[in-house]
């Protein structure tokens, strides 16, 4: 694979929601639907100067030299996926719902493949979302915020603990007028500070006073 970007890059991870169940229910329709899915993702990635580095059967891993190219890819793919559907033998409409996650950072490129924690975080960000949803990390949001077109915005989803990662991540949802905006709660654990009112932080910076008060209470017993 030639001309893969190095240094600071952006990864896009995608996954078809409930793909195992769909294969059980619609084995024939899924063959055609998956072919459309693969074509849509490939065209979206390549049209935005990206590279597909791995296919997973129900998703792709792609890399971009800029975060904006990655976000443009996700938006373009979601729009096309919403228009693509298969009709089953019982006249049910089958539309694939794809969750997407993006993260920006450094990764080691070796023998045509990437390694490092940046990929792990991108995968966990993707897994926190739902079909049709595009989530990005805080660093990706910082990089693209001033460069987004007027019809694209970022919705602050708060800070979340992601499975297997020590450091919590502030997540943002990419919002576009013609894409779904409302989704269930993320598949993650919000950090405790998300739910604490600000007045509960009044003792921050007053450790000495608290220690002395504790000593006085102890001596009075």
Predicted stretch roles:
Residues 39, 61-176:
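Catalytic beta-strand-to-alpha-helix segment of the class III nucleotidyl cyclase homology domain
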Residues 4-5, 54-57, 126-129, 194-198:
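Short glycine-enriched loop/turn motifs at secondary-structure junctions
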Residues 31, 67, 95, 207-210:
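Short, structured helix-loop boundary elements
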Residues 57-58, 105, 206:
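Conserved phosphate-binding and hydrolysis motifs of nucleotide-dependent enzymes
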Residues 1, 131-132, 139-215, 220:
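Intrinsically disordered, glycine/charged-rich C-terminal tails and inter-domain linkers
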Residues 1-75, 79-83, 87-88:
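Catalytic NTP-binding/metal-coordinating core of nucleotidyl cyclase/transferase enzymes
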Residues 5-7, 95-97, 219-220:
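Short loop/turn elements that form and flank the Walker-type P-loop nucleotide-binding site
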């Amino acid at each position: 694979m030639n001309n893969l970007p190095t240094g600071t890059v952006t990864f896009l991870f995608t996954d078809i929601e409930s793909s195992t169940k769909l294969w059980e229910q619609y084995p024939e329709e899924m063959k055609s639907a998956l072919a459309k899915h693969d074509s849509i993702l490939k065209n979206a990635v390549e049209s935005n100067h990206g590279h597909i580095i791995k296919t997973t059967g129900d998703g792709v891993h792609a890399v971009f030299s800029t975060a904006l190219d990655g976000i443009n890819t996700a938006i373009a793919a979601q729009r096309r996926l919403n228009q693509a559907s298969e009709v089953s033998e019982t006249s049910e409409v089958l539309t694939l719902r794809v969750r997407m996650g993006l993260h920006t950072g450094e990764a080691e490129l070796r023998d045509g493949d990437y390694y490092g924690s940046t990929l792990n975080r991108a995968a966990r960000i993707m897994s926190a979302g739902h079909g049709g949803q595009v989530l990005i990390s805080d660093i990706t949001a910082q990089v693209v915020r001033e460069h987004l077109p007027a019809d694209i915005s970022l919705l602050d989803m708060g800070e979340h603990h992601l499975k297997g990662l020590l450091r919590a991540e502030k997540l943002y949802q990419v919002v576009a007028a013609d894409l779904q905006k409302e989704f269930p709660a993320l598949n993650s654990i919000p950090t405790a500070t998300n739910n604490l009112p600000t007045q509960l932080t009044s003792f921050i910076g007053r450790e000495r006073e608290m220690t002395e008060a504790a000593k006085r209470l102890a001596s009075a017993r």
